[in-house]
């Protein structure tokens, strides 16, 4: 990121970026609307640069971290995209079998941020699998804009099957204890909710700012849930009260948190929407929750 100070950027700019990042605005319209905020020495290119992810400078756990075994694998998704690539990570010095975590990316494929989250989960003592739903189209293309375009071309139902197949792969992995949870971000948060509905033996689900399932599907949920929302993310968080009411009505085990004054994507430390305080707290809660549920 450059020298623009986050506190000097109006919330409307982050809202515009959210629309762009979720394909509700094309690039041309986004830049046109962004120009209204290019004042006081700010330029549209500078704002664009500020809002885009910075992967090189914000990786917490490097790909070659000596504490980990981390490598790409392929697994079969017969009902989905066929052969799916994913990053499998686990602690190098693990003694015994580990709880498993499926790490589900946003709406742009398996980018460096999500790979990093997979490695963070492994450092926390789990075996993690971060699949790439773009595998049938050649995989994550190296930038998020192209990744979003590719992901929009995939059939949603087939992508859901790809992540359910990832669950089966990890559950049966020789180094997994058979207890597998899922954590997902944005699109991945919606996938985590979907898996809670559709996978009866899922051990735990942690959606970060994910779209909620149909309320009529809530009775099907078996897994304990931990849900993280952002107060400024009005689009997604608006669905939380009704979802929570349905969880309560159906006697489901859940913990829900709404983090004040933070945006959708607050856990993603490669963009200016990142909020370290909220991200650190949400991640600690997540790791502790998985530690309890995946024993």
What are these regions (language model features)?
Residues 1-29:
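N-terminal secretory signal peptides
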Residues 18, 27-52:
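N-terminal export signals
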Residues 55-94:
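N-terminal cap/lid segment of alpha/beta-hydrolase-fold proteins
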Residues 165-222:
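Primarily recognizes the serine-hydrolase "nucleophile elbow" in alpha/beta-hydrolase
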Residues 227-229:
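Short beta-strand/loop motif that positions the catalytic acidic residue
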């Amino acid at each position: 990121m450059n020298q623009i100070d986050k506190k000097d950027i109006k919330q409307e700019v982050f809202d515009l970026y959210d629309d762009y990042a979720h394909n509700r605005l094309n690039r041309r319209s986004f830049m046109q609307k962004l120009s209204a905020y290019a004042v006081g020495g700010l330029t549209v290119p500078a704002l664009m640069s500020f809002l885009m992810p910075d992967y090189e400078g914000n990786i917490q756990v490097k790909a070659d971290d000596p504490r980990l075994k981390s490598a790409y694998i392929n697994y079969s998704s017969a009902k989905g995209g066929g052969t799916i690539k994913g990053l499998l990570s686990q602690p190098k010095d693990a003694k015994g079998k580990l709880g498993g975590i499926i790490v589900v990316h946003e709406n742009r494929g398996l980018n460096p941020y999500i790979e990093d989250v997979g490695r963070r989960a492994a450092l926390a003592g789990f075996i993690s699998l971060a699949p790439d739903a773009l595998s049938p189209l050649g995989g994550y293309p190296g930038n998020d804009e192209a990744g979003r375009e590719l992901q929009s071309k995939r059939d949603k139902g087939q992508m859901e099957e790809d992540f359910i197949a990832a669950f089966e792969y990890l559950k049966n992995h020789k180094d997994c204890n058979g207890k597998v949870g899922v954590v997902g971000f944005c699109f991945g948060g919606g996938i985590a909710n979907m898996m809670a509905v559709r996978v009866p033996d899922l051990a735990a689900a942690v959606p970060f700012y994910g779209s909620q399932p149909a309320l009529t599907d809530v009775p099907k949920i078996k897994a304990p849930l931990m849900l993280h929302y952002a107060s400024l993310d009005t689009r997604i968080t608006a669905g939380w009260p009704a979802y929570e009411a349905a969880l309560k009505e159906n006697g489901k085990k859940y913990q829900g948190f709404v983090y004040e004054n933070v945006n959708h994507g607050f856990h993603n430390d490669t963009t200016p929407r990142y909020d370290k305080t909220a991200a650190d707290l949400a991640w600690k809660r997540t790791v502790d929750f998985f530690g309890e549920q995946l024993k």
